[in-house]
Amino acid sequence: MKINGTPFRSIWCEAGEVRIIDQRWLPHELRIVPLRTRAEFAAAIRDMWVRGAPLIGATAAWGMAVQMAEDPSDASLAETWQVLHETRPTAINLRWALNEMRRLLAPLPPSERAAAAARRAAEICDEDVEINRRIGAHGLTLIREIAERKRGRVNILTHCNAGWLATVDWGTATSPIYHALEAGIDVHVFVDETRPRNQGALLTAWEMNSHGVSHDLIVDNAGGHLMQHGEVDLVIVGTDRTTAQGDVCNKIGTYLKALAAKANGVPFYVALPSPTIDWTVRDGVAEIPIEERSSAEVTHVQGKAPDGSVISVQISPDGTGARNPAFDVTPASLVTGLITERGICAAEAGAMEALFPEAARSAA
């Protein structure tokens, strides 16, 4: 997508090195940084210089490629898989991308691994862009149907950032929105701030503003109120891991939005790229590990000071503890449908397997 009219991806190669947008500084500062070592790739994923399941996977793939150029030995391959895999436990794309790289590289002689790894990492990025473009095309049909029925503006609520900053390009939940904008449909987006890291306020709002999408930032607890009063036509969220039966693990607070949508008859859709499906897991609540992050993310907020610097400010009393689960699981029964690159389906095993029979068979 574009920043000030210039096309960008969230991760790319330039002058022989991998570069990313360091998202910790957005929206107040655009910092582009190189990643040159395995340690830097691990830090970028773990400390959320990059975030979003698809982008985490793409970053891990490039981390493997850079390490193979440094040391293509069997020991290095195994250690790099482990180091990168341990950075974020919830997002399934991380494991998927690392397994893709390991399957490709393990049978090859070390002398061939660096070139093969770089090719595959680039392919993973290009594949992600195409997957998200197709998700947008399918999701556009939902938005168009509402626009034709209402004969007016379509109001969409989204949670966290499932935009192009969470993928290589287009985004998942935002891709239908961008497609609708290009199609001339009048859309308005309610952006959840998404505490505690405020990815909605910091990142999604920045994306919407950069692309000229009409939007309002709302506090996390306002969504239910807006739905009660008929101000939300459609909810579209992303996912960090979706089970074989359609349970959706996404940023903390997604479950509450799904409950409110169900109670108020608002369609609740999940934009789901197929690499985010974990065909080995059936019960999301019982089986998906939920990352618990630092309590400081809850007790402190980061923002722009009057002098323009970005600072962290404590908001809770000294001595107050905080729980900080980063994700929750929305049961499939609350999901209206899954928007995938192959079409829209119900959040249930049979419908998902019908769209992706080869993936379901390989996991059986």
UniProtKB/Swiss-Prot annotation:
Pathway: Amino-acid biosynthesis; L-methionine biosynthesis via salvage pathway; L-methionine from S-methyl-5-thio-alpha-D-ribose 1-phosphate: step 1/6. Substrate binds at residues 51-53, 88, 199, 250-251. Signal peptide: none annotated. The active site is at residue 240. It catalyses: 5-(methylsulfanyl)-alpha-D-ribose 1-phosphate = 5-(methylsulfanyl)-D-ribulose 1-phosphate. InterPro entries: IF-2B-related (IPR000649), IF-M1Pi (IPR005251), IF_2B-like_C (IPR042529), Initiation_fac_2B_a/b/d (IPR011559), M1Pi_N (IPR027363), NagB/RpiA_transferase-like (IPR037171). Its EC number is 5.3.1.23. Catalyzes the interconversion of methylthioribose-1-phosphate (MTR-1-P) into methylthioribulose-1-phosphate (MTRu-1-P). Belongs to the eIF-2B alpha/beta/delta subunits family. MtnA subfamily. This is Methylthioribose-1-phosphate isomerase. It comes from Cereibacter sphaeroides (strain KD131 / KCTC 12085). The lineage of its organism: Bacteria, Pseudomonadati, Pseudomonadota, Alphaproteobacteria, Rhodobacterales. The gene is mtnA.
